[in-house]
């Protein structure tokens, strides 16, 4: 499982021109782009959610848990692109939608159980993500 975490001052995700999830924190928040591979499960999702929630990448070495920073979760199968051969990425390392969708939901649910305010995109939809990256700070987490 991979989560590309970006520290943001705002982020929103739209489907068909309609905003389906948005965060506009008073300070900082996190955008989490979540990729799932074949051997991932809800337990890994919970472990990665805990790691991200406690990750000290906000101002003054604070974590989202420390300040109650909101989180926007967006599924992102392209995090498992294989570009070693040719010019066209291969997606065989990404879990199929039927496997990945409940794991992405488990990740968001685990964050909520930790106390996070979570907004989310729509799994499998063509989404437009708008964000204002702060820093910029972008970190790849992987289990």
Swiss-Prot record:
GO terms for cellular component: cytoplasm. A motif (Gly-cisPro motif, important for rejection of L-amino acids) lies at residues 135-136. Its EC number is 3.1.1.96. It comes from the Bacteria. InterPro entries: Daa-tRNA_deacyls_DTD, DTD-like_sf. HAMAP family: Deacylase_Dtd (MF_00518). Homodimer. A Gly-cisPro motif from one monomer fits into the active site of the other monomer to allow specific chiral rejection of L-amino acids. This is D-aminoacyl-tRNA deacylase. The gene is dtd.
